[in-house]
Curated annotation (Swiss-Prot):
Biased composition annotated in UniProt, kind: Low complexity: 446-458
Residues recorded as bearing Phosphothreonine in the entry: T35, T454, T484, T897
Protein name: Cell cycle and apoptosis regulator protein 2
Region (Disordered): 1-35, 178-218, 446-510, 568-643
Keywords attached to this entry: Acetylation, Activator, Apoptosis, Biological rhythms, Cell cycle, Coiled coil, Cytoplasm, Cytoskeleton, DNA damage, Isopeptide bond, Metalloenzyme inhibitor, Methylation, mRNA processing, mRNA splicing, Nucleus, Phosphoprotein, Repressor, Transcription, Transcription regulation, Tumor suppressor, Ubl conjugation, Wnt signaling pathway
Disulfide bonds: none
Functional note: Core component of the DBIRD complex, a multiprotein complex that acts at the interface between core mRNP particles and RNA polymerase II (RNAPII) and integrates transcript elongation with the regulation of alternative splicing: the DBIRD complex affects local transcript elongation rates and alternative splicing of a large set of exons embedded in (A + T)-rich DNA regions. Inhibits SIRT1 deacetylase activity leading to increasing levels of p53/TP53 acetylation and p53-mediated apoptosis. Inhibits SUV39H1 methyltransferase activity.
Subunit and partners: Component of the DBIRD complex. Interacts with ZNF326/ZIRD; the interaction is direct. Interacts (via N-terminus) with SIRT1, which inhibits the deacetylation of substrates. Interacts (via N-terminus) with SUV39H1; this interaction abolishes the interaction with SIRT1. Component of a nuclear receptor-mediated transcription complex composed of at least ZNF335, CCAR2 and EMSY; the complex stimulates the transcription of nuclear receptor target genes such as SOX9 and HOXA1. Within the complex interacts with EMSY and interacts with ZNF335 (via C-terminus).
Location of cross-link Glycyl lysine isopeptide (Lys-Gly) (interchain with G-Cter in SUMO2 and SUMO3): K591
Length: 923
């Protein structure tokens, strides 16, 4: 066992160099290697699954294979003990479920590996371990079935192989590996036959005349994936173990104690965080020596006991998010490019400290900020304003609200142990946004001050991601100008127009160079982020994502409460029994066909006949048709079960056995629930085309429900599963039962699918207007209150709602609500004005182009008129010449006619004289 441990530790320096097998003695492998020594690795994988690692499911190619382990895509390490089914060969395509742990020497380790059956005939040659891999195949009734595709003595090697060891006859290892992972379920023996039969049919089709290089294009449907956490998001505090359980790939510092989730009290369910206000933050791209944006301002009396940091949010606003969602819904008939997901549009402004993205903020200074930060909440706010001004150049003193988002607590070691507290605030950055007039004046001032860059400088500068909004707006403006050729003609001919492009219409706050704008998707979802991200930024991004999940999930919950329940007619007992008998007969027929087809393939090597059941591209057998319309009379429950069985076929899914226990055992990923194979998504999408509408056409939902659906739908598939909708409701923290969640989800679900893209939406708000409070907060009123608070999801009630001001009582809450409504209306009108300005600019461009065209046509018409006048004058001259010539001809005719008659008479006289002078003939 110690020899195996040395082999695991030593040959992996840097996580890339996978060396060969360890040296064995002349007496054979040691006794410890006769049984697979993978208990330690399996226990680690189990801890990772229960602890908090981030997992991915993807398709890769085996690039290296050794005695006890292999490598996929030169970066994912897997042991042979995690292989499900037949052992893969070198160069084969496999389906991998890998877990990421940056603390290990190899960060990506496979948890499960499965060889894909539908692979082309030409593959990379098998390694020298082919005889060992053959032992790991499933045993049939008559023994092991040899794989005819992989024969190393017929196919020459394409890759240089290492010399084969003389002592590699450890049959006990692979046999024990086979016994420890038997085929589960009733399809254990049938799956291998189905896959082999499918491969043989593919080979015959290709041998029948299809070229080797011809390959059917893969479907472009994205895999089904949702943004969902497997735990309730109402825990007020997270310690070291809780963070490891929630976020598996997170490296927690050794001095970390706990983090208090203050956003739960700052944004209760009754007053959630609003993305209504646009707050755009751009990083200046000026080439100047920028200070370290993560460096804290140096003060003489800085005290590390308290630190204040800010989470600067950059969001396009709710109207822009609605517009993207409506584009996705409107493009059902003609799908275009998929719009950008809301998680990619929500960004955070971060600083840089030693090539690492950190939060903006610094330590508390008693002389500059105040004396007691624990008693006076404005002290740490002053610290945040001072540090943000020094690091980013943004003045946050104009912000009206400062919400406490989280509090980190660290333990400073030493003889006098000290507690360090880091308070993270979320200020309302949208209140310091410049107005349209100020923004246009600022852009014009910068355009006037900046000299036009030369072509060489433009060629040397590389595009950066520091000001994406301005670049996108400039690109949109140039795209609109390029759509009409008349506008281009006007720009070329008109020399009075300014050369500088017009400023973008969306105001933004400008930050100093050196900062970075990272999207929420880039922090949480990226497998390989471009920036090194600090621990606090990672935790805050996860917490912000959980807050959005709770808020959007609560909107879905209120929407489900406002919808009427479905009336499902109970199935008749006679039809139900007939449907069950028909389903049993169909299952038996499928099993018989699967057993008979390999025998038919062995006897008939020719092409498949028309009577054989055709196989689909994904390897599924078609369902035999039922007679007499009994398929239409099946109950809805059995139809949904058949759909689930087809979607969860064991040949397609790698995690079929873990699907039901995924939520109960807390094995889900920390930020997503992923469907394992893309073929499942293709089948589901094809089945969605024939589905009826979920709701009555009269049921119209508000746009915030559409945005909530889009938030959970990570890949814009257009639908959500029943299971995921139930989990969304169960993670809200309102203590719903599983039966309650199931009944609510049944209002919008048809055949286990909620096709939200086909629903109707409008700009209406206030779904919870007629709902009682005890219904809005679930079962919280039935449970004992935890501590002092009666309802964690409810906002704290204030007894002093009236404030005396200038001799009159003012209801502050009502004023704030009215101001919020007016602000919402103002933002809506501003968005409409912005849209009208764009249309007006487009109309102006078209009008200018039309004017240029009119001028050109007028000049051409004037020229044609001149040419027409010249042609008319020429015609009149020709007419006069014609008349003159006609008169001359008539005069000549009149004079020549008598002369002709006179000549005729002279000729006649001459003839008569000649006849008279002829002598008489002699007798």
């Amino acid at each position: 066992m110690s020899q195996f441990k040395r082999q695991r530790i030593n040959p992996l320096p840097g996580g890339r160099n996978f060396s060969g097998t360890a040296s064995t003695s002349l007496l054979g492998p040691p006794p410890g290697l006769l049984t697979p020594p993978v208990a330690t690795e399996l226990s680690q994988n189990a801890r990772h699954l229960q602890g908090g690692e981030k997992q991915r499911v993807f398709t890769g190619i085996v690039t290296s294979l050794h005695d006890y382990f292999g490598v996929v895509d030169e970066e994912v390490f897997f042991q042979l003990s995690v292989v499900k089914g037949r052992l893969p060969q070198l160069g084969e395509k496999v389906l991998v479920k890998a877990a990421y742990n940056p603390g290990q020497a190899v960060p990506w380790n496979a948890v499960k590996v499965q060889t894909l059956s539908n692979q082309p005939l030409l593959k990379s040659p098998a390694p020298p371990l082919l005889h060992v891999a053959a032992l790991g195949q499933k045993q049939g009734i008559l023994g092991a079935q040899p794989q005819l595709i992989f024969q190393p003595h017929r196919i020459p090697p394409l890759f240089p192989q290492k010399p084969l060891s003389l002592f590699q006859t450890s049959h006990t290892l692979h046999l024990s590996h086979l016994n420890r992972f038997p085929a589960r379920g009733p399809h254990g023996r049938l799956d291998q036959g189905r896959s082999d039969d499918y491969d043989s049919k593919k080979r015959k089709q290709r041998a029948g005349g299809e070229p080797w290089g011809a390959k059917k294009p893969r479907h472009d449907l994205p895999p089904y994936r949702v943004h969902l956490t497997p735990y309730t998001v109402d825990s007020p505090i997270c310690d070291f173990l809780e963070l490891q359980r929630r976020y598996r790939s997170l490296l927690v510092p050794s001095d970390f104690l706990s983090v208090h989730l203050s956003w739960l009290s700052a944004f209760p369910l009754s007053q959630p965080f609003s993305l209504h206000h646009p707050s755009r933050i751009q990083v200046s791209s000026e080439k100047e020596a920028a200070p370290d944006a993560g460096a804290e301002p140096i003060t003489a009396d800085s005290d590390p006991a308290y630190s204040s940091k800010v989470l600067l949010l950059s969001s396009p606003g709710l109207e822009e998010l609605y517009r993207c969602c409506m584009l996705f819904v409107d493009d059902m008939a003609e799908p275009r490019e998929t719009p950008e997901h809301p998680l990619k549009q929500i960004k955070f402004l971060l600083g840089r400290k030693e090539e690492e993205a950190v939060l903006v903020g610094g330590e508390w200074s008693p002389s500059l900020d105040g004396l007691d930060p624990q008693a006076d909440p404005q002290v740490l706010v002053r610290t945040a304003i001072r540090c943000a001004q020094a690091q980013t150049g943004i003045d946050l003193s104009g912000c009206t609200k400062w919400w406490r988002f989280a509090e980190f607590q660290y333990l400073q070691p030493g003889p006098p142990r000290r507690l360090q507290t880091v308070v993270v605030y979320l200020p309302d950055v949208w209140t310091i946004m410049p107005t349209l007039e100020e923004w246009e004046a600022l852009c014009q001032q910068k355009a006037a001050e900046a000299a036009p860059p030369t072509q060489e400088a433009q060629g040397e500068t590389e595009p950066t991601e520091q000001a994406p909004d301005a670049l996108e707006q400039a690109a949109d403006t140039s795209r609109r100008n390029a759509e009409t050729p008349e506008a281009t003609t006007q720009q070329e001919t008109d020399t009075d127009l300014p050369e500088a492009p017009p400023p973008p219409l969306e105001p933004a706050v400008i930050a100093r160079p050196g900062c970075v704008n990272l999207s929420l998707h880039g922090i949480v979802e990226d497998r390989r982020p471009k920036e090194r991200i600090s621990f606090e930024v990672m935790v805050l991004a996860e917490l912000f994502l959980e807050m959005l999940q709770r808020d959007f999930g609560y909107r879905v919950y209120k929407m489900l409460l406002s919808l009427p329940e479905k009336v499902v007619s109970p199935p008749e007992p006679e039809k139900e029994e007939a449907a069950k008998e028909e389903a049993t007969k169909e299952e038996e027929a499928i099993k018989e066909e699967v057993v008979k087809e390999p025998k038919d393939e062995a006897q008939n090597e020719g092409p498949a006949t028309e009577s054989e059941a055709p196989l689909k591209e994904d390897g599924l057998l078609p369902k035999p048709l039922s007679s007499g319309g009994e398929e239409e009379e099946k109950p809805r429950g059995e139809a949904s079960e058949d759909l689930c069985e087809m979607a969860l076929d064991p040949e397609l899914l790698l995690l079929r056995d873990d699907g039901e226990e995924e939520f109960a055992g807390a094995k889900l990923e920390d930020s997503e629930v992923r469907s394992v194979a893309s073929n499942q998504s293709e089948m589901e999408f094809s089945s969605l085309q024939d589905m009826p509408k979920e709701l009555d056409p009269s049921a119209v939902l508000p746009l915030d429900c559409l945005l909530a659906f889009v938030f959970f739908d990570a890949n814009w598939c257009g639908y959500l599963h029943r299971r995921d909708l139930e989990r969304i409701l169960l993670t809200l923290g309102i203590r719903l039962s599983a039966e309650q969640a199931k009944q609510l989800v049944s209002r919008v679900v048809t055949q286990n699918i909620c096709q939200y893209r086909s629903l109707q939406y409008s700009r209406q708000e206030g779904l919870d207007g007629g709902l009682p409070e005890e219904v809005l907060f679930g079962n919280l009123d039935l449970l004992p209150p935890p501590g002092k608070s009666t309802k964690p999801g409810a906002a704290p009630t204030e007894h002093k709602a009236l404030v005396s001001h200038n001799g009159s009582l003012i209801n502050v809450g009502s004023l704030l609500q009215r101001a919020e409504q007016q602000d919402s209306g103002r933002l809506y009108l501003e968005n409409k004005i912005h849209t009208l300005e764009l249309k007006l600019e487009e109309s102006h461009n078209r009008f200018s182009a039309t004017e240029v065209t009119n001028k050109t046509l007028a000049a051409e018409m004037q020229e044609l008129r001149v040419r027409l006048a010249e042609a008319e004058e020429t015609a009149r001259t020709a007419e006069r010449q014609k008349s003159q010539l006609q008169r001359l001809l008539q005069e000549l005719r009149r004079r020549l006619t008598p002369l002709q008659l006179e000549i005729q008479r002279v000729v006649e006289k001459a003839d008569s004289w000649v006849e008279k002078e002829e002598p008489a003939p002699s007798n």
